[in-house]
């Protein structure tokens, strides 16, 4: 499935797990609420869809990348306490609350959201000392001897072994206790997200011409070469700021985000061509309604790649115009609401002052 399908299925799962009957009990008992295990390549938006699901459902979200944790922070620190057994006192080992479980309780306390999603990323890339804890977590929904609070749905994500050398396979016993989903990179789905996030028109134009370069992972003698959706989005954000500052985005800069030599070189060449088209066609003048006659003849005779680039240049300019218009409208609406409330308060104050004056003179 693609990332959009995965989002919808996880969202449906959370809604089903949190559905209650007339008595206020969960329709699916907690013991039957299997954790969701989402496996897919890195950088395709697994964490982002969890944020979207939590926001759309109005539930809490606690997200952790488990590779950043040690066994002590995940399970808790040991301490000694005394207990009496059969008339004798013994020293026994107890554990402090898991940092992850404590974060869930803090979220409940601070937000008032008693239901939510506990998202654990890179769950199959943990260290050898933490691996048994993760198996216990998926099988029993506990960290150490502490359970996940009721009403919190577990979603875990990991990478297939071809993307990460430190991946550990789950055994059949664990897989039989989870909902296993496999997600793949899909440019058509990402393109919808990219438009909503105002990803650079130059990048979208390039990927329309080279969709095969959207997501690539290859191993050669020089090591791993890869391109991910995250890389395209982060590069786009940098390009937007560099353009405002007047800085050039060259091949060296692109290689810092696109870790594939051939693709980075190809993108750099295309960006140079994209900028040339912007100057040659006079895109700002076209958007102002001033089109030179020779422009029609040139675009008519142009190759498909050139036409597509010009279309994206025009769309980029329109998007910037619409963005400015939306910002100005939002600012106007905010000022209108402020002045309306200010006027109401002034009228209330004047009315109160008038009534007080009347009372004072006995009218």
Regions found by a protein language model. Give the residues of each.
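Conformational gate/switch positions in structured elements
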Residues: 91-93, 229, 359
């Amino acid at each position: 499935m693609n990332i959009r399908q995965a989002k919808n299925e996880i969202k449906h799962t959370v809604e089903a797990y949190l559905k209650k009957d007339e008595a206020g009990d969960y329709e699916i008992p907690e013991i039957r609420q299997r954790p969701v295990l989402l496996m897919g390549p890195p950088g395709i938006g697994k964490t982002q869809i969890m944020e979207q699901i939590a926001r759309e459902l109005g539930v809490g979200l606690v997200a952790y990348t488990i590779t950043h944790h040690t066994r002590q922070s995940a399970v808790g620190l040991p301490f000694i306490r005394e207990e009496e057994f059969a008339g004798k006192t013994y020293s026994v080992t107890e554990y402090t609350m898991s940092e992850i479980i404590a974060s869930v309780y803090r979220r409940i306390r601070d937000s008032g959201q008693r239901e939510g999603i506990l998202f654990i990323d890179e769950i199959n890339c943990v260290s050898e000392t933490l691996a048994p804890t993760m198996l216990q977590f998926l099988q029993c929904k506990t960290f150490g001897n502490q359970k996940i609070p009721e009403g919190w749905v577990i979603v875990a994500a990991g990478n297939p072994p071809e993307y990460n050398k430190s991946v550990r396979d789950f055994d059949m016993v664990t897989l039989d206790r989870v909902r296993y989903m496999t997600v793949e990179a899909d440019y058509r789905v990402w393109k919808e997200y990219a438009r909503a996030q105002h990803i650079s028109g130059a990048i979208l134009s390039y990927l329309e011409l080279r969709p095969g370069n959207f997501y690539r992972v290859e191993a050669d003698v020089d090591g791993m070469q890869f391109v991910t959706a995250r890389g395209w989005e982060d590069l786009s954000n940098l390009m937007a700021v560099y353009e405002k500052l007047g800085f050039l985005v060259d091949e060296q800069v692109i290689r810092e985000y696109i870790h594939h030599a051939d693709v980075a070189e190809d993108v750099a060449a295309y960006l140079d061509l994209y900028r040339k088209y912007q100057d040659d066609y006079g895109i700002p003048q076209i958007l102002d309604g001033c089109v030179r006659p020779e422009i029609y003849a040139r675009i008519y005779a142009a190759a498909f790649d050139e036409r597509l680039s010009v279309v994206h240049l025009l769309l980029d300019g329109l998007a910037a115009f619409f963005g400015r218009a939306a910002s100005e409208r939002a600012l106007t609406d905010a000022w209108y609401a402020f002045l309306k409330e200010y006027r109401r308060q002034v009228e209330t104050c004047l009315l109160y002052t008038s009534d007080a004056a009347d009372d004072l003179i006995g009218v």
